[in-house]
From Swiss-Prot:
Phylogenetic classification of the source organism: Bacteria, Fusobacteriati, Fusobacteriota, Fusobacteriia, Fusobacteriales
Chemical reaction(s) catalysed: Co-precorrin-5B + S-adenosyl-L-methionine = Co-precorrin-6A + S-adenosyl-L-homocysteine
Similarity comment: Belongs to the CbiD family.
Protein name per the record: Cobalt-precorrin-5B C(1)-methyltransferase
Record keyword Disulfide bond present: no
Record keywords: Cobalamin biosynthesis, Methyltransferase, S-adenosyl-L-methionine, Transferase
NCBIfam families: cbiD
Organism: Fusobacterium nucleatum subsp. nucleatum (strain ATCC 25586 / DSM 15643 / BCRC 10681 / CIP 101130 / JCM 8532 / KCTC 2640 / LMG 13131 / VPI 4355)
Pathway terms, separated by semicolons: Cofactor biosynthesis; adenosylcobalamin biosynthesis; cob(II)yrinate a,c-diamide from sirohydrochlorin (anaerobic route): step 6/10
GO biological process, one term: methylation
Pfam families tied to this protein: CbiD (PF01888)
GO molecular function: cobalt-precorrin-5B C1-methyltransferase activity
Keyword Oxidoreductase assigned: no
Amino acid sequence: MEEKELKNGYTTGTCATAAVKVALEALIYGKKATEVDITTLNYTNLKIPVQKLRVRNNFASCAIQKYAGDDPDVTNGISICAKVQLVKELPKVDRGAYYDNCVIIGGRGVGFVTKKGLQIAVGKSAINPGPQKMITSVVNEILDGSDEKVIITIYVPEGRAKALKTYNPKMGVIGGISVLGTTGIVKAMSEDALKKSMFAELKVMREDKNRDWIIFAFGNYGERHCQKIGLDTEQLIIISNFVGFMIEAAVKLEFKKIIMLGHIAKAIKVAGGIFNTHSRVADGRMETMAACAFLVDEKPEIIRKILASNTIEEACDYIEKKEIYHLIANRVAFKMQEYARADIEVSAAIFSFKGETIGESDNYQRMVGECGAIK
């Protein structure tokens, strides 16, 4: 039976942006939209239906129904809402994210951050940088130099209940869901379909250019980091969580060199010998980080803090001996090469959420030079 093509959806961040745009245009222009055009962070143009719009003298609110496509997302079908209010001066709100002409606040059903290590500071609403960027872009476009300022409250009526079915409580995001999105699009694929797609892409790259080396990255962060440091993105493939499968694919297609670029939160799993990095398959992040900390002679109290950390980013805050990242990069390269059981060489570089390279394997610079991987 031919496998059906799965439908993509849009993120909570895209929904929040759409709700802000509809509400603000209603308040300023009197426009009562039934659908709204949104351009996502990866420049995808969407036409999103409006679920509900309410306008009063000094504020407007809008609800957008979350659509996850064929992705198994617990937020699918819930309402993501925005209330906008025009003011002359922005009030002081502890949880708010402030910009020149607006403040973005998480209301009912949007979580707030209580632990370090996330992209949002402790005490702030769990509205990530990607959605904030989309929202402020819409506000700037609509206000277009006006002196007016906007109080934006994002709220999710079912958010508190839905959050209990996510990792938010464990991650220290309390009281609701997070408003997320690095691209604005939710890509849906079955595991088999995704693997077939990645193998086909890798095969084309091998046969089209006849190069025997490849760059692996876990996702969007890795791709952006590849661009930032000047590596040849035409030789880069996104491997998602499927490290082991893609190593096997590279061996089958007779690649001789793999350059692995990975965020520390994913790379640490590979350093521990985990070759499917999905959170439901295996974890061991803190344990592997603690073991590496022991090997570079970190203090016992730091190792205890690492083991008790909520995220790897938090654990990294405790690290004093930065050579740990060199060790981790070497472990990633070694474990991947060991897994391959073939005549293939692996090098690795790891980076932080800030996009800084924090560790390289011993052979990384040599391999990059030999491959001509710098554009």
